[in-house]
């Protein structure tokens, strides 16, 4: 398991799950779709709770990944195999946590950063599943109250 410094245990598990999911699907990269699946696999993450409340789960996500990308021969990947966009999402999660003066980078920061990249495959999977990315982002950030409803 890789250690991502500054990230919570749940966020670390989600990032490592993203790597594992991409490996198992035989993909040669780790993209936003794998990050979404990694977040969904983290059963206790608050980002997962929000996604589940909207009807998204790991099975639906993995099916959508297979449909959109296909399946290859299982492979071995590392954090260097994150796509430039996914690396940007991870970097943005750090920026979001700092803006909140948070002492950690959690699953909600990863999810929020991904949702800001509306044209990524992770967001497209959510949209194709009938989930409004802008509304999800609004709910994640606390909506009009300005208070975050989900944290981990």
Where are these regions (language model features)?
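Histone-fold recognition with a strong bias for associated Lys/Arg-rich disordered tails
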Residues: 1-152
